[in-house]
């Protein structure tokens, strides 16, 4: 293992202790909540235990280092019917760039239902419509440091709008993707949404900083096999909530149909998830369609996610 490899792993691992120091002081201390919502139907169907899976173009959302698995010009478009009549659309393209690197571009757009303005003097409504929403634009670069270890970096511009007022911020993600050499066992880590405090009007707030550690391996078969059974376990440490854990699984049959399931521990509104995927051949290329369902508490309608992706 090279010096730079050891340095990157050491820097990422030391952040675990920083997250753990304030275990009981973290709830509700960040903004830009839409960044916590999983955009990909494949990842959501696996309970978001995806950091060490991340072998398709949606890796840009979960582990930019995983973009080194991309060998052509790939794309993905995703739609989520979220709670309270809100929705999320996202898209990403990625391609090889340089001898050992890959480049990715992505966007996320979060839209809420318009609502009527109310004031102290007019609590029933003024007749004026208020619009609100969020957007994130990102550029990512992934590089193979060795045959087994990849490093990823993502810079992201985020903006939140409520009527005429805006909050803006720049964030950075740092991640690793390590292929152990034992079967297809993979270890991965990411620090997400690193950046300075943002400001909305006169109020300052922190970004939803996360540090995730994940391991994944196929118990049966491997990618492209007639039958593959993949399992994944992930720990998520956050600055604004207690530690959380994700378990996920994915089964591919004939490298054509996928069935997925997962469970998210210590979430207020979510627990189990299920999903499915279909791979279609189009000439020498392929199109993959994914769908996912997340179980929510009784107060909210369960969100549905749809994704379509492929290569050129």
Features from the language model and the residues they span:
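Hydrophobic h-region of N-terminal signal peptides that target proteins for export
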Residues: 11-19
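Sec-dependent signal peptide recognition
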Residues: 3-10
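Subset of outer-membrane beta-barrel
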Residues: 21-312
């Amino acid at each position: 293992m090279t010096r730079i490899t050891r340095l990157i792993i050491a820097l990422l691992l030391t952040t675990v202790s920083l997250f753990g120091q304030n275990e009981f002081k973290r709830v509700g201390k960040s903004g830009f909540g839409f960044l916590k919502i999983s955009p990909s139907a494949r990842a959501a169907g696996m309970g978001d235990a995806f950091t060490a899976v991340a072998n398709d173009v949606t890796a840009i959302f979960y582990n930019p280092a995983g973009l080194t698995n991309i060998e052509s010009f790939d794309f993905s478009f995703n739609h989520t019917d979220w709670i309270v009549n809100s929705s999320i659309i996202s898209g990403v393209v990625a391609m090889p760039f340089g001898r050992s690197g890959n480049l990715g571009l992505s966007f996320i757009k979060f839209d809420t239902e318009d609502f009527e303005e109310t004031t102290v003097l007019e609590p029933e409504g003024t007749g004026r419509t208020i619009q609100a929403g969020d957007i994130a634009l990102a550029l990512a670069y992934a590089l193979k440091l060795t045959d087994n270890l990849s490093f990823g970096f993502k810079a992201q511009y985020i903006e939140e709008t409520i009527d005429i007022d805006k909050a803006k911020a720049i964030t950075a993600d740092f991640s690793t993707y390590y292929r152990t050499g034992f079967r297809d066992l993979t270890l991965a880590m990411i620090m997400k949404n690193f950046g300075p405090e943002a400001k909305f009007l006169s109020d300052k707030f922190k970004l939803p900083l996360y540090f995730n550690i994940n391991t994944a391996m196929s118990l049966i078969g491997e990618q492209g096999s007639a039958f593959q059974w993949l399992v994944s376990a992930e720990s998520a440490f956050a600055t604004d909530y207690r530690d959380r854990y994700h378990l996920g699984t994915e089964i591919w049959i004939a490298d054509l149909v996928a069935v997925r399931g997962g469970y998210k521990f210590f979430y207020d509104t979510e627990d189990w998830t299920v999903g499915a995927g279909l791979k279609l051949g189009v000439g020498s290329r392929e199109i993959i369609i994914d769908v996912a369902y997340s179980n929510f508490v009784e107060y909210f309608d369960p969100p549905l996610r749809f994704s379509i992706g492929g290569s050129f």
